[in-house]
Swiss-Prot record:
Gene that this polypeptide is encoded by: trhO
A GO MF term: oxidoreductase activity, acting on paired donors, with incorporation or reduction of molecular oxygen
UniProt entry keywords in alphabetical sequence: Oxidoreductase, tRNA processing
Species name: Delftia acidovorans (strain DSM 14801 / SPH-1)
Protein name, per record: tRNA uridine(34) hydroxylase
Function noted in UniProt: Catalyzes oxygen-dependent 5-hydroxyuridine (ho5U) modification at position 34 in tRNAs.
Enzyme Commission no: 1.14.-.-
PROSITE patterns: RHODANESE_3 (PS50206)
Highest taxon in the source lineage: Bacteria
GO terms classed as biological process: tRNA modification
Amino acid sequence: MSDILNISCYKFTPLPDAAALRDTLAERAQALALKGTILLAEEGINFFLAGPAQAVHSFVDQLRADDRFADLAPKESWSDTVPFRKMLVKVKREIIRMDHPTIRPAEGRAPSVSPATLRRWLEQGHDDEGREVVTLDTRNDFEVDAGAFKDTIDWRITKFTEFPPALRAHKAELADKTVVSYCTGGIRCEKAAILMRDEGLEHVYQLEGGILKYFEETDGAFYDGGCFVFDERRAVGADLAITPLAPAEPLEPIQPTSPPGKA
């Protein structure tokens, strides 16, 4: 087995002390010799870390000691080397920028669907009520180009702030369908699903844990290609191992200072 544990995780929870928390988490990460990115905002936390398993687990255990983070459930994968160059801890306006202040996931989220349930729906061609199921990719266009669910809806957005106007332009196409929004790890599709509900779409779900959790808990069926990740691995396949990108696919910054799929 490879020696380096990579985790990604987020939690929408009020963090009025985000600035002070930044200093605390930076010190902890440095003491454990971890590398990656931690983003904090008043709406929550979003982080991507890599290092020896014991160090990574120690960091997560310390986070869970704070009641606000007690239920953190990081997604895990392994690599031979650390795919980040440094440790960044930043305070942002949003942990995933949508520029839509009425969307507050900490106050309530849209229903979610498990990876196993989505796989079953896609296999049978409809949900449990017989309604047509469509998947909606909420990532940026170049991420979609690296891999996506078969026949997914892709609005070719270049940043997440373009999602709300794209939804308004295409909302009628989603009526009477069961829509499952998805993204890399769940954070974008959580906001997207809430917005779709607010816009009057009734049968909307988010894919719990995103593509990475789908890979972790299923065989990756109905997904073509890899999942773009914002570190030196570039992309991972259904087995969560590194998979090559096509040469024509653009290279984004290795370690973003904004969340995956930069806003």
